[in-house]
Amino acid sequence: MSVDRVWTFAESDYQYGVGPLRLRIERIDRAHPIRSDNEDWYPVEGVQVSATGSELSRRRVLVRGSRLPG
């Protein structure tokens, strides 16, 4: 996984927030999935990034496993 890449997650693919989330992922905790909606969701840590590329804030969210990189 490239630490420089920004991933965009639809509102339905992460918990919790409103609207799409642009995140530079720093860590995916694949050892501790949480089962919800008949899918595995994973704790993810990273930096939220604006549409213009500015860093906004650190975030910890659950992301639908099927939407995560590698």
Predicted regions mapped to residue ranges:
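Short coil-to-beta transition motif at edge beta-strands of beta-rich domains
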Residues: 1-26
